């Protein structure tokens, strides 16, 4: 303790301890345990910082680490010193000024341990946000005061809803020209359907932004000192008192609508005290019935400390979040959900989820969220998917790319293991007979593909090593070899996603790559129900092959266009039950290549109603072939159409360029779904086929004199235009040397 007291006097200067020079202050930020033992759940928060690209997430995280004593000096994302933010540890991130991988850290604020994951804002890296939100208890949604709710904000909102994550909203960049926090809150309500209200309002905006008003405590807050590190409280300025009173009343009404206790006080016309209001905000936020809105400017060092206070006051600790594991019963397809116990001791068996893999300097690094029990260094744990027993050789907690060894981790902790062979989404337990798995991470399907090959044929070994590592790390990065064209095809979430992997291949494996033209992940489907009655027979002397299947194919609803489903409606033993999985396997294998253009078949259901088998000749391979043949037969009887991915596109540009921008979207077969305008700028929302979006960045720069910008996010699949379908079929026929007359019929 004496050492810590002396260290605190030194502040951010270099410290020497046991002969080691540190460039960070020795502070309680490094302390994960209190004097009585283990940090209780009440003093732990696991949060993520998520937002649309360029909303200021990484800058905000940098300020959080500085004010909590975790780092000694702040650096900007694109600062003149060229150092870059601490959380952007990858060289490509510092070079481009964007976050590519989610980065984890932890810090202390008012004796509470806060684990933070800073996530990317670009739609191409959406899997990083997906798996971060899967393992976090709460989140901070950052909005730009100028842009408000944007494309990726909507995606993050859907992800938070999927995993039931409570969150605060922080409206950032109030110092920017055109900032309008009130508009951002209205968009939270109208676009995202949240019961949102200010718990703080700014004292001025743009160049007049001086501080914030706390509506709960009814006081003004100013941030003094060179880096805003000193918070000064004062009375609310006279010119803002009326607005503060109105906004506080609006806050009380919003919370009263979602909290029973405050609602009763509101009906009885009682004025709630701070002691009444804070617990009510917390209760409503934890149930996702209310969204507290805070304001500030991370770049100008204003509003960050009150945000940290709000994380402690309004976001849940691990014991307040229910996490379930799926128990698979032996000899049965039935499953049951088991509630994980968040006690921070060794009384319960260990259960953890590997949510992210990364190749570090010392081998594979596996990020794990501990959901139950305790994990010690040197413990043996079991991978429930593979059944393999592995030893925890090294246990670390992470601060961006800096690792700190720890001896143990408890329920509620986020840590990392070395040397563990696993895949993203695997569950680990301390018992070998546990047939448990944590509820899985949603992995979106890739929407774009390109061919990739090393520039030098001698680098094939390096290329295959890099591809192997990247596919293990990122479930949205897929690779397959195309036999017809003899090319390696990589698929991902967008052009930037695949471009980053090509650059990483050169930087990390010294293997420069050549990329082909992007290819869109089209799908094929049917537009009407079609029956099948297919018999597979093969006689070659001795035991032959025989399998007969009867049923029908039917199209799925548009929201299920990326799925294929199988339904067994057989009664009796005409198709023995042991052969039904073989029929499904044959059907799914045949869905890999459609009849029109060779793209995957999806958006349909295979319903098996009846069939026949032979006592001697029927076997598994017979019914696999029968399943394949049944699909082909039914598709020949049905009308086949091609599906294409549609992107939600958001374009922001000066108002004088509105005409050319709209004309450009119309040329690309886009459908305009909405429009906003303010302060000389307009925002256009449109649904555009991904196939028509290639090269749009340069067109937008050209028609707006470099002043326009756009973002896009995957929305859905829908049938493409007849002209597009005809063009795709002709290209496929040319590539395969077939004649159009031999092809299946075309829709429309």
UniProtKB/Swiss-Prot annotation:
One of its GO terms (molecular function) is GTP binding. InterPro entries: EFG_II, EFG_III, EFG_III/V, EFG_IV, EFG_V, EFG_V-like, EFTu-like_2, G_TR_CS. Residues 1-33 form a transit peptide. One of its GO terms (biological process) is mitochondrial translational elongation. Residues 42-319 form the tr-type G domain. PROSITE patterns: G_TR_1, G_TR_2. Disulfide bonds: none annotated. The keyword Heme does not apply. Keywords: Elongation factor, GTP-binding, Hydrolase, Mitochondrion, Nucleotide-binding, Protein biosynthesis, Transit peptide. Pathway: Protein biosynthesis; polypeptide chain elongation. It is found in: Mitochondrion. PANTHER family: ELONGATION FACTOR G, MITOCHONDRIAL. This is Elongation factor G, mitochondrial. It comes from Xenopus laevis (African clawed frog). The gene is gfm1.
